[in-house]
Amino acid sequence: MTAQSAQSDNQVLLTMTNVSKSFPGVKALDKANLTVKSHSVHALMGENGAGKSTLLKCLFGIYAKDEGEILFLGKPVNFKTSKEALENGISMVHQELNLVRQRNVMDNLWLGRYPLKGVFVDHTKMYNDTKAIFDELDIDIDPREKVANLSVSQMQMIEIAKAFSYNAKIVIMDEPTSSLSEKEVEHLFKIIEKLKDRGCGIVYISHKMDEIFKICDEITILRDGKWINTVPVKGSTMEQIVAMMVGRELTQRFPPKINEPKEVILEVEHLTALNQPSIQDINFELRKGEILGIAGLVGAKRTDIVETIFGVRERKSGTVKLHGKIMKNRTALEAINNGFALVTEERRSTGIYANLSIEFNSLISNMKSYMNKWGLLSDKKMKSDTQWVIDSMNVKTPSHKTTIGSLSGGNQQKVVIGRWLLTQPEILMLDEPTRGIDVGAKYEIYQLIMQLAQKDKGIIMISSEMPELLGITDRILVMSNGKVAGIVETAKTSQEEILQLAAKYL
């Protein structure tokens, strides 16, 4: 698929010029610019906190801009709500999908604008109109199916179809592939090409550089709220884009290997989860100071391994040994007390308490250690440990009382890792630790993982990003349909070998 195919009729659809927005103590946008053309995919890039979300919220009327001009189809606009923007032809497919799960697909597509036959909803027309849109976009979903029964990728297709139904001129996609398999990503890209062919302008927000270079035509880079540059994808390199994003040249994508695996610390033998389908007969060893990656396609049950070890998924059979001693880990609390820690995949839903402070989020897994014999909390020790998390994890924040939800994804993840380190684990399990994190913060997370391995922690890291696994691990365990398809040495393997193993039991 060529992303850079030239279109002779690239009409300018949207121009945002010198848009600024300030909040108390923070200038979130400082004369930011964005120009989107028809028949094109335009990447909006920048580290977390660069101003991407604020710029789009100014477009949708969620924030009132302080200054600047927005032109849509050549006319000045000042939308007061996202509904007004949508009705005028600007749609957004959010990372957190906005669907009513207990209603069916066509209800969601036409919510608030049902076709009527007299005073009654015309269900036949609604079905036929939905089917026509799905046929045009090659979406194979029954319009009468309940949304709750669909996969994340199918829900995403409905959001795109909804934008299509409004005859949107501009479709904004926020991290659209974060939960998709490789096959689903390819399908999404085909739909994006169809939208391009219809004359749409797509604004594509993603931290995945390979996707940007595959599907996009132009890239706008923001940094610290400022417009840095807009460049064509053709003729640009990943290194140039990263340098503009972070304000410095990132000579290496991954830090140098400084860890040295030693003796075996963890033995997992014949591990099978109780509720199937799940993991079956899992066997592997982990050495002190080793980073063991876990690879596999979506649905391979990679997460089930760490959940079963950690006690949040019930074990049917098998043993987990730490230093040769059997660990039952019947609950997460028992696992924590035995020296295990788990950084979960869904940071926002299961990793952080978004509306509470950095202090609370840093200490919650170890709260018992801050109580004296009368059950009172030691404020001094709590403040000291929170400051340790902030300093040692290099968390960028004005205060330990700052709400964690206001931090960038990278800083949130650092707090979560720091929280678990306060429990002094010997085994640290990380499930998709860099998902939704910008390229500069990713490098910091990699450095942190490497340093922990150097301090003799045993690290298990699940990742869907193949370059990440190949760049940071010592060995890779490949899962296929709940079983171990193979364990390979990272230095001697290839992406092709890993993908072949991942398909072994399909």
Curated annotation (Swiss-Prot):
It catalyses: D-galactose(out) + ATP + H2O = D-galactose(in) + ADP + phosphate + H(+); methyl beta-D-galactoside(out) + ATP + H2O = methyl beta-D-galactoside(in) + ADP + phosphate + H(+). GO terms for molecular function: ATP binding; ATP hydrolysis activity. SMART domains: AAA. Part of the ABC transporter complex MglABC involved in galactose/methyl galactoside import. Responsible for energy coupling to the transport system. InterPro entries: AAA+_ATPase, ABC_carbohydrate_import_ATPase, ABC_transporter-like_ATP-bd, ABC_transporter-like_CS, P-loop_NTPase. Its EC number is 7.5.2.11. ATP binds at residues 46-53. Residues 14-249, 264-506 form the ABC transporter domain. Belongs to the ABC transporter superfamily. Galactose/methyl galactoside importer (TC 3.A.1.2.3) family. The complex is composed of one ATP-binding protein (MglA), two transmembrane proteins (MglC) and a solute-binding protein (MglB). Keywords: ATP-binding, Cell inner membrane, Cell membrane, Membrane, Nucleotide-binding, Repeat, Sugar transport, Translocase, Transport. GO terms for cellular component: plasma membrane. It comes from the Bacteria. It is an enzyme of class 7 (translocase). Transmembrane segments: none annotated. It is a peripheral membrane protein. It is found in: Cell inner membrane. This is Galactose/methyl galactoside import ATP-binding protein MglA.
